[in-house]
């Protein structure tokens, strides 16, 4: 890996959960530069359309460039076709772009999630352009192994919005306790047919388990 891609990384734990009627995309907020905490307020959940979001893990510069590209591509898709882009189509556009650049890859792990006429869905997209439709939940980044332990244990089908938020926050908290590249609080986005909402910090605090 070149020095350029070693400079600033998001480190990261990201989580995507499908619930009854929508999707939760959640991340923590730490960005690292080697052993240095480079940022305590890194934004890792981005709006792609009013019904689709994307989380980023990996190189900050690579990820931010991809956010700009997919924003433009989704806007062009909707202008040309005169209809809203689906979650699957957005993931495919991103996947194709990454695959075309696989010999000079972007150092990223991405989640693309949202709602369309088929309902809620979340896709994971790797640096080579591999896109996978995740049925229930997914986690990426350096803290994902710890997050998966919580997700596997506590996920249940047809969760409510409240239950899904609580699970996402709990999974992130577990990762932050064990992964040095994850920390500094939470970003949580709720996506349904009615809203694309960034959950404020005071509301997120209400989902945190009591301190031991």
From Swiss-Prot:
GO cellular component, one term: cytoplasm
SUPFAM superfamilies assigned: N-terminal nucleophile aminohydrolases (Ntn hydrolases) (SSF56235)
Chemical reaction(s) catalysed: Cleavage of peptide bonds with very broad specificity
InterPro entries (UniProt xref): Ntn_hydrolases_N, Pept_T1A_Psome_bsu_arc, Pept_T1A_subB, Proteasome_bsu_CS, Proteasome_sua/b, Proteasome_suB-type
Single GO MF descriptor: threonine-type endopeptidase activity
Keywords, comma-separated and alphabetical: Autocatalytic cleavage, Cytoplasm, Hydrolase, Protease, Proteasome, Threonine protease, Zymogen
Pfam family, one: Proteasome
Residues at the catalytic site: 12 (nucleophile)
Keyword Oxidoreductase: no
Subcellular location: Cytoplasm
Presence of the UniProt keyword Ribosomal protein in the record: no
Gene Ontology terms: biological process: proteasomal protein catabolic process
E.C. number(s) listed in UniProt: 3.4.25.1
Activity regulation behaviour: The formation of the proteasomal ATPase PAN-20S proteasome complex, via the docking of the C-termini of PAN into the intersubunit pockets in the alpha-rings, triggers opening of the gate for substrate entry. Interconversion between the open-gate and close-gate conformations leads to a dynamic regulation of the 20S proteasome proteolysis activity.
Propeptide: 1-11
Record's function text: Component of the proteasome core, a large protease complex with broad specificity involved in protein degradation.
Family assignment from sequence similarity: Belongs to the peptidase T1B family.
Assembly, per entry: The 20S proteasome core is composed of 14 alpha and 14 beta subunits that assemble into four stacked heptameric rings, resulting in a barrel-shaped structure. The two inner rings, each composed of seven catalytic beta subunits, are sandwiched by two outer rings, each composed of seven alpha subunits. The catalytic chamber with the active sites is on the inside of the barrel. Has a gated structure, the ends of the cylinder being occluded by the N-termini of the alpha-subunits. Is capped at one or both ends by the proteasome regulatory ATPase, PAN.
Protein name as it appears in the record: Proteasome subunit beta
Native source organism of the sequence: Methanocorpusculum labreanum (strain ATCC 43576 / DSM 4855 / Z)
């Amino acid at each position: 890996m070149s020095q350029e891609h070693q400079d600033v990384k998001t480190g990261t734990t990201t989580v995507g959960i499908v619930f009854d009627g929508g999707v939760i995309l959640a991340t923590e907020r730490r960005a690292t530069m080697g052993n240095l905490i480079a940022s305590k307020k890194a934004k890792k959940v981005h709006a792609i359309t009013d019904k689709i979001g994307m989380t980023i893990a990996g190189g900050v510069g690579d990820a931010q460039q991809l956010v700009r590209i997919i924003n433009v591509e989704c806007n062009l898709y909707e202008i040309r076709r005169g209809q809203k882009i689906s979650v699957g189509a957005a993931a495919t556009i991103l996947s194709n772009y990454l695959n075309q650049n696989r010999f000079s890859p972007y150092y990223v792990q991405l989640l693309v999630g949202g709602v369309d006429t088929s309902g809620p869905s979340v896709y994971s997209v790797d640096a080579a352009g591999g896109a996978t439709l995740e049925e229930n939940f997914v986690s990426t980044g350096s803290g994902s192994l710890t997050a998966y332990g919580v997700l596997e244990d506590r996920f249940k089908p047809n969760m409510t919005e409240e239950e899904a938020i609580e699970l996402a926050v709990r999974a992130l908290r577990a990762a932050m306790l064990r992964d040095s590249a994850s920390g500094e609080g939470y970003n949580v986005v709720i996506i349904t047919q009615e809203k694309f909402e960034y959950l404020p910090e005071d509301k997120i605090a209400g989902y945190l388990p009591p301190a031991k």
